[in-house]
Amino acid sequence: GSEMCIRDSHCSFSWASEENTDFIDTHFSTVQWCISSEGLYYSVNKKGARAYGGAWGGTSSTYHHNLFAHCNSRTPLMNGARGKDPGQDIVVYMEYINNVNYNWGSQMATYGGMDESQDPEHHGWSCNFVNNYYKPGPATTARVKELKFFRQSSAREPNKAPLRAVSKWYFHGNVMEGNSQLTSDNWEGVYTDGNYPYSIDEMKASSFIIPSGKENYEQYWFDWESYTLSDQYESAEKAYQSVLADKSGAGAFPRDKVDARIVKEVKSGLCTYTGAGDANSGAIPVSYTHLRA
């Protein structure tokens, strides 16, 4: 944690035993045009089934035009303002814009936002979740009972780290392919876990969130107007096309065989591999056996 001024662009991450990518407790970071795909379902991880896309967070961070594909969960886990250990965030401001999520396999695939920092300088958690494209795949259809964009989580350890405040969200323009209700009203696709003490209405921001607290928190100050995507983003449908574009989309170029296959599967709505004991998931089993869906 505590790394500063990070930019990951046109990278490809796959086949990890925990999360494919971790960008948490960072300051002034951008992750753009990257692919996170095919996490290992059952591998060397003693915790059991994983296949996680990533844990993303950080103070003043932007995530745009990235692709999650064939990951069971954490697509992404949005890391909270924890502030429990040295280097952890006491404030989180995120822009999560124009990303594509395909074939997730867990009901709470995108979740997080815990605002639990006990630091006296705690300053809250906020996110602009705008114009992202969700496309259910074979694993989603088989395993997810109710489609959702996001689940707001409570504290990791409720008895030790109670929530300090409600996390603030601006949900706008997100598309759930095949579901007109969630597409027209994004907040219908947001829910909370059973321990969260705040209501959905309390989470809502009515317009694009602008970071606050510059005067009191100089270490988190940045020239927001120069770096924000608030007036530069595409529609979710256009972002879907941009992310999957053959010569200018997400991933490292020229795309290798893995990334080329991943993009083809997103377009076709199919998958190649199955997680161990889980038909049509898209996740990679520990044996790496080539199983056709």
What does each model-identified segment do?
Residues 1-8, 289-293:
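Conserved small/polar residues in nucleotide/adenosyl-binding loops
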Residues 7-15, 27-46, 52-78, 82-106, ...:
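Right-handed parallel beta-helix
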